[in-house]
Swiss-Prot record:
Annotated keywords: Heme, Iron, Membrane, Metal-binding, Monooxygenase, Oxidoreductase, Transmembrane, Transmembrane helix
GO molecular function: brassinolide synthase activity; heme binding; iron ion binding; monooxygenase activity
Name the record gives this protein: Cytochrome P450 85A3
Source organism of this protein record: Solanum lycopersicum
InterPro entries recorded: Cyt_P450 (IPR001128), Cyt_P450_CS (IPR017972), Cyt_P450_E_grp-I (IPR002401), Cyt_P450_sf (IPR036396)
Localization annotation: Membrane
C-alpha cells in the first residue's frame, strides 16, 4: 500500500510541476510569429513520438498544421518543411542565414570537420578535395575498374551458398568495397576486420540521442570512432614515411596535399574518410538490398534489367570487365536505383540550422532553430509520381524526373551529394553481376522496418542458384 501511495504522490507531484512547464513552453514558443505546431514535453520535446511513430507522426502533424509546422525533435526546436518549392529554396540558399544542422550525435561520431558539418569557404574547399577523387574522370579511369574487380571477386564467394541473408551480404559488400577503394585493404585482412568492428558501432551511433553512457548506441559510436581514428592515424603515418603513392582514395588525397592543391589537416583527412565510408555504406547496402527485393517482387522489371545487362555481356568475353561506356548505357538500371531510393525512402530528409532570425513562408524562424527539409512525403505525392506506392522504374525513363525540383534524394544546392555517381556506379556494378549470375527466391524474413532507417528486422533471406 505504501508503495502505491509513493507512486501516486510522485505522479501527482510530476503533474503539478509539469503543468507550469507546459504553460511556459506554450508562452515561449507562441510569443513570436512561429509556424503552427506542438512542442511536446519539456527537454524531450516530441522525439519519442517522432522515433516511435516515424512517418505517421509527420503525416498526423501535416494533416493538423499543413506543410510547414514547428516541433521539438532530437533535442532541438525544429521547423519541418514538406513544401517542395520551399525545400528547394532552403537547399539553394545556405549562405543566407543557414548552415548544416545535423544532430549532435552525428557530428560527434563522424567528426566536426566532415563535409556535412562544415560550411562556407571550408565546405567549398573540402568539397573540391573530395570531387578531385570521385569526379567522372576518376570514376572512369580509376574507381570503376576497382569496383568491377571487387564485385567479381566478392560475389564469387556466394556461388557455394544456398540460402543467404541478402541484407547482411549487401552490408558486407558495401563496406568492404568502400574499404578497398579507400585504402586497398583486402576483405580477409586483419586491418579490414578491425575497421569493420569499429565501423558497425559508428553506423549505430549516428542516429541516437547523445547520451554518453556505456549501454547506449551513442557511447558505442564514440568508441567505434576512436578505433577507426587510431587505425587511420597509423596508416597515414606509415604512408608518409614511404615515398610510394598508393592508387586509392587515401593515397590520392595525400598526393593532392603533396602537390599543394588541397592541403587537409590529419583531422580533416580522417573525418572525410570516415564520412565516405559511412555515406557509401548506408546508401549502397540498403539500396542494393531493396533493389533485389523489388526486382524479385516485379518479374517484368527483373526481365527488363536482365535484358539490359545480358546485352552488355554479349559484347564481351567472360572475363572482360564492364567499363564506363557500359555504365552510362545502363539506363534501366539507373531507373531501378532511383525508383528504389524513392519507394523505400533510404533518405528521409536533410537538416539546416538558422544562424539568425529569418522569415520563411510568412513566419519568423528564430536563430538557432533547426529546419528539417522532410522529403519523404514528396516521394509519395501522386501529383509528382502517379500511383506512388507502385514500383515502376519506367516512370524515370518516360519523364525527366531526376531533373525536377522535387528530386531531392541526393540533396540539393551546393550540397548535392558529391558521391552520387560513385554510389550509382557501385550499385549498378553489383546488380550487373548479381542478375546475370543468379536466380533467387525469398525464403523468409521479409518483415521490413522503414524508419528511422530501412531494415529487415530478421534479415532478408533468399535462396540463390546459378542462372
Amino acid at each position: 500500500m505504501a508503495i502505491f501511495l509513493i507512486i501516486f504522490v510522485v505522479f501527482f507531484g510530476f503533474c503539478i510541476l509539469s503543468t507550469p512547464l507546459f504553460r511556459w513552453i506554450d508562452i515561449v514558443y507562441n510569443k513570436k510569429n512561429l509556424p503552427p505546431g506542438t512542442m511536446g514535453w519539456p527537454i524531450f520535446g516530441e522525439t519519442r513520438e517522432f522515433l516511435n511513430q516515424g512517418p505517421n507522426f509527420m503525416k498526423n502533424q501535416r494533416a493538423r498544421y499543413g506543410n510547414f509546422f514547428k516541433s521539438h525533435i532530437l533535442g532541438c526546436p525544429t521547423v519541418v518543411s514538406m513544401d517542395a518549392g520551399l525545400n528547394v529554396y532552403i537547399l539553394n540558399n545556405e549562405a543566407k542565414g543557414l548552415i548544416p544542422g545535423y544532430p549532435q550525435s552525428m557530428l560527434d561520431i563522424l567528426g566536426k570537420c566532415n563535409i556535412a558539418a562544415v560550411h562556407g569557404a571550408t565546405h567549398k574547399y573540402i568539397r573540391g578535395a573530395l570531387l578531385s577523387l570521385i569526379n567522372p574522370t576518376m570514376i572512369k579511369d580509376h574507381i570503376l575498374p576497382k569496383i568491377d574487380k571487387f564485385m567479381r571477386s566478392h560475389l564469387s564467394g556466394w556461388d557455394n551458398c544456398n540460402v543467404i541473408d541478402i541484407q547482411q551480404m549487401t552490408k558486407e559488400m558495401a563496406f568492404f568495397s568502400s574499404l578497398d577503394q579507400i585504402g586497398g585493404f583486402a576483405t580477409s585482412s586483419s586491418i579490414a576486420q578491425e575497421f569493420r568492428a569499429g565501423f558497425l558501432n559508428i553506423a549505430l551511433g549516428t542516429i541516437s540521442l547523445p547520451i554518453n553512457f556505456p549501454t547506449t548506441n551513442y557511447y558505442r559510436g564514440l568508441q567505434g570512432r576512436k578505433t577507426i581514428v587510431k587505425l587511420l592515424r597509423k596508416i597515414i603515418e606509415d604512408r608518409r614515411g614511404s615515398k610510394k603513392i598508393q592508387q586509392d582514395m587515401l593515397g590520392l588525397m595525400m598526393n593532392e596535399e603533396a602537390k599543394n592543391r588541397y592541403t587537409l589537416s590529419d583531422e580533416e583527412l580522417i573525418d572525410q574518410i570516415i564520412t565516405i565510408m559511412y555515406s557509401g555504406f548506408e546508401t549502397v547496402s540498403t539500396t542494393s538490398m531493396m533493389a533485389v527485393k523489388y526486382l524479385h517482387d516485379h518479374p517484368k522489371a527483373l526481365e527488363e534489367i536482365r535484358k539490359e545487362h545480358f546485352a552488355i555481356r554479349e559484347k564481351k568475353s567472360l572475363e572482360d570487365p564492364i567499363d564506363y561506356n557500359d555504365f552510362k548505357a545502363m539506363r534501366f538500371t539507373r531507373a531501378v536505383i532511383y525508383e528504389t531510393l524513392r519507394l523505400a525512402t533510404i533518405v528521409n530528409g536533410v537538416l539546416r540550422k538558422t544562424t539568425q532570425d529569418m522569415e520563411l513562408n510568412g513566419y519568423m524562424i528564430p536563430k538557432g532553430w533547426r529546419i528539417y527539409v522532410y522529403t519523404r512525403e514528396l516521394n509519395y505525392d501522386p501529383l509528382i509520381y502517379p500511383d506512388p506506392y507502385t514500383f515502376n522504374p519506367w516512370r524515370w525513363l518516360e519523364n525527366n524526373l531526376d531533373h525536377q525540383s522535387s528530386f531531392l534524394m541526393f540533396g540539393g544546392g551546393t550540397r548535392l551529394c558529391p558521391g552520387k555517381e560513385l554510389g550509382v556506379a557501385e550499385i549498378s556494378t553489383f546488380l550487373h553481376y548479381f542478375v546475370t549470375r543468379y536466380r533467387w527466391e525469398e525464403v523468409g524474413g521479409n518483415k521490413l522496418m522503414k524508419f528511422p532507417r530501412v531494415e529487415a528486422l530478421n534479415g532478408l533471406w533468399i535462396k540463390v542458384s546459378a542462372y
